[in-house]
Every structure is written in C-alpha cells, then in structure tokens.
Amino acid sequence: YTGFEDLNMQTYIVVSAEVLSRYVFRSDVAYDWNISMDELNEDTRKFKEDHLNTFSRKNDRLDWSYYPQEPSANDSENRNAYLHELGKITNRSRFVDGLNVDAPYTTTAHYWLIKQMVNADEWRMISDDDFSIRNAFYRVFTKELRLSDAHHFICQVNKTKSRKQCLKEFGQAKAELLDWGDIRGFKTKFLRTLASHYLTELLTSHQFHEEAISKDGERYRKYADNPIKHPLATKDKGFYSVDCRTDLSALEPNEIAKMLLNVNDHSTNSFIQQIRRYISSLERPLTTARGDKKSYIYANFNPKYAQFAITILRTYYNFCRPFKSADKKVLTPAQRLGITDKQFDWKDIIYFK
C-alpha cells in the first residue's frame, strides 16, 4: 500500500514492571482485533457518531471512532471531504482486521487491571513525563493519590546522547560522588550509599512542590517542575533527571532519598529490549538497499498474534530467564518478587508442571 505508512498507524505497547525485581506485570498491545468496519458503520448510523463530540462517541477509544456517512442536505460537510474520508477508511479496512486503540485508553485499562491484580496499600509509579500515562495513572489511583498512598516519580532521559558521551558522564558521576564523599568525611566507597547520603543532604533544601496562594487567599502546594540530576549515572544513558509530581512534604529527606535512588527505567527497558530481540515481527520497518523506500518484511501485520507472542515472552521472561544483579544472585524476576522459589523452563510452562 503505497503511502499507507503516512496514515501514522503506529501500534503502541504499554508495559509495566516492578522496578527492583523487573517482574513484568502486564504488556498490552493498543489494538482491538474484535471490532469490524461493519460494526463501526452500524454504530455510526445508530448513534449518529459522526455528529457527536468525541467524549460522547461509543468507539472514541479507536483511532477511527466513526464511519464516514454520506452528507445529507443539512450537513456542513461537502461530498469531496466525505469521499476523501471514505477512501482513507476503505484503504485501511483492506490492510488488516481490527483497529488501533488510543494509547491513553489502553494505558487506563492497563493500570486498572494491575490495580485489581496486585494487593498493595501503597503505590510508587515511575514513568517519563508523558501526559497520557499521567492522566491514566491519576484516573485509576485517584483515591490513593488523595490520601498520599500513591506517588508518581518522573524519570527523564536525554536519548540524543552518543554512547561515548554516556560513558563519559558515567565516569564523571562516579568521580564526583567519590569526591563529595571524601569532602564530607565518609569512609565508604560504595556509590549507592554515598548517593543516598548526597540525596538526603540535597533534599533538606530542595523541594519538588512549592507553596502558592489562591484567589481566595488560601495556601496550597503545587507542582514546582523542579527536577534534580540523579547522582548515579548509567553507562547507557549517562546523567538523567528525576522529579516527583505528587507532594512528598509529609516524608523525611532520608525517606525521599531512598525512593529516588530507585527511580529509573531499567525494568521496562529490559523487557522492551527482549521484545525487539526475540519478536522480529515487531521491529520497525527497514530501509531498503537503495535507501529511498521502506521494507515491511518484518512488519507486524497481525496485532492479535503480536499480543499472544508478547504474553508468551513475558511469561518466559518472568519465570524462566534469570539475570545477575548487583547482589551477585542469579534469579528470575518471579523468584526475586517471591512468587516462586524455582527457575522454570519451557516444559514446565507447556505441560503445567
């Protein structure tokens, strides 16, 4: 389909994992393979979806929330615009069954299902500063956020850095932290311990929220958009910034420092890397040898089976694939989380051993 990629049919995958054990709770493809164009057309005719605001549409979760209808005498839409929209959706219907789902809708459902699955009194959420993620998290965990039982940390990474620059920043961060420890009189050379002391000292004066006064003269605290540089740079990302969008004023600096030390995106990045490595059908389109066109030889033409493949990989990743962590232990994510005390293999999963 020449020019079809210009329709921006990106299919998103929403992944959530536990930061310490790297256990992946869910991995959901933002796609509805059960919906058909006939159903969309029927809903549009029945509920007049093409004349409603987006928030009132039954199928607003889909990238095509209504099916184009021929304009009546009282419609403001002209026939040329109708034919243009009809041509686009007709071309889309010939491509693959089903329709893409908006990422915010999938993310909201994703978090809701995790909330039902995980029995927890307090929640600590780490993400980049993406509006759809923030909106979904705040909708699902409204009560917990209001009671300060949930906090949202932001991890921002500059992905334009070169590998060389990241390695340079990693060495720089290590040297700066050791120098700071010597100046403060700490005998330990353990970087994580020094980073904890550094953050505790910094947070005695640094605030992620600030006081403001409303029009009625009432004082309240608001997000200050005041991130800090994480003292522990990494080899693949270099320096990165951390922030918190929820109010932490009720906590002591050492408690906040302990949480900030764990703010990173390693757990989700690790699983996404496995998806790219083991499920070739989810790779991005490749540039052809001539460099002027795209080759979709590995493109994903069936999101339904992509979801199946990701779920199988997630099970293998959680229960069968061990990794070595800083504590020198080689365990699977499920073992680290305490779900099981053994490492499984494919036969255990296939035959339910």
Give the residues covered by each predicted segment:
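C-terminal domain-tail junction helix/linker
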Residues: 215-219, 223-227, 234, 242-243, ...
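RNase H-like nuclease fold core
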Residues: 1-120
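Intrinsically disordered, low-complexity acidic Ser/Thr-rich regulatory segments
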Residues: 64-119, 211-264, 293, 297-298
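Short, conserved catalytic/metal-binding motifs centered on acidic residues
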Residues: 1-2, 22, 125-128, 269, ...
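Inter-helix linker motif
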Residues: 145-168, 172
